[in-house]
UniProtKB/Swiss-Prot annotation:
Primary gene name: cbiD
Protein name (record): Cobalt-precorrin-5B C(1)-methyltransferase
Coiled coil: none
Region (Disordered): 353-376
Keyword hit for S-adenosyl-L-methionine: yes
Gene3D superfamilies linked to this entry: CbiD-like
GO molecular function, one term: cobalt-precorrin-5B C1-methyltransferase activity
UniProt-listed HAMAP family: CbiD (MF_00787)
GO terms (BP aspect): anaerobic cobalamin biosynthetic process; methylation
Cysteines paired by S-S bonds: none
Organism of origin: Agrobacterium fabrum (strain C58 / ATCC 33970)
Family (UniProt): Belongs to the CbiD family.
Amino acid sequence: METDGKTLRRGWTTGTCAAAATKAACAALLTGEFPYPVDVELPSGARPAFSLATEEKGENFARAGVVKDAGDDPDVTHGALIESTVRRGEPGSGITFRAGKGVGIITRPGLPLPPGEPAINPVPRRMIETAIREVAGENADFEVEISVRDGEKLAEKTLNGRLGILGGISILGTTGVVIPFSCSAWIHSIWRGIDVARATGCTHVLGATGNTSEKAGQAVYDLPETALIDMGDFIGGMLKYLRSHPVERVTIAGGVAKMTKLAQGMLDVHSKKGLADLEALAVLAAEAGGDDNLAVAIRQANMVAHAFQLAESVGIDLGAVVAEKAWVTAAAALKTPAIALDILVFDRQGALKGRTTSTPSHQPAPSSFGDRNRRT
């Protein structure tokens, strides 16, 4: 992968690091020696090798640690020490997992593992099991305890608390590899948030583009925390998942700029995907009753927030029109009349600037405003 002419390095997931640490600890428990380096098998069949950052051998256990290298991805767990402590299990117990310090415990239903389990996801578990069997053979009986140094603090920068994963981070990974600046991890967290909301009985979820819109939307509807989905820029990712994992009602809440992009037909509202089209916004202002002077001023505005201020100063409700057009885009992506949909548009201070009523979504004709959405 390249950006600005620079090739970006891929990295390794916490699951891969945990598997490598476990294999080394298991080998040391059986032979008295830590392998160096230690290789593990990824789901793809590739076999990366890792150096050990920590080694410890006790009477009934062995512990090894691997420092996570996320490559050039701005991962909050980059540089974290992932350690595995391996002990012999009871005969016939198989491979069991425990959460050590810094690894979370699942407390809510709806996640891939039931409440009470350590937050070591299914693919990392399979990788760890494979790693153990490579050194101990089939029918191995071991207890594996994964810990992460400063995992409790790292977890504060993740969505674990929202998902009901308490006490630390999750051990994650589906491929074993971290792709720099991939949106995959965020989209998967959106999906898990919807799963938890459904499993805890939420019939109305609110997807927000940021903290301000989430808090403001919460003030409107007084929803439980499990109903709040931090969708960020990935509106389409949330709506597409809701097609096959429906709830009765979904609210999309966002700031004026991101909701203007949604109104223009963009389902990924990150700045890298395109800018809000002030020309199209001027057309909307005219549809709302604005005169030519307002249209000219909006075309010359510094940003969308400025355009909203200009419209408001002359009594034009631009927020209502943007909310309506954003609803059209979102309803087309949702593709089901079974889910009621509404839009909330907020300014940077959290003041409500536009909203739609909760209306069963359908597949309407494309908006003319949405056809003007590719100015960069």
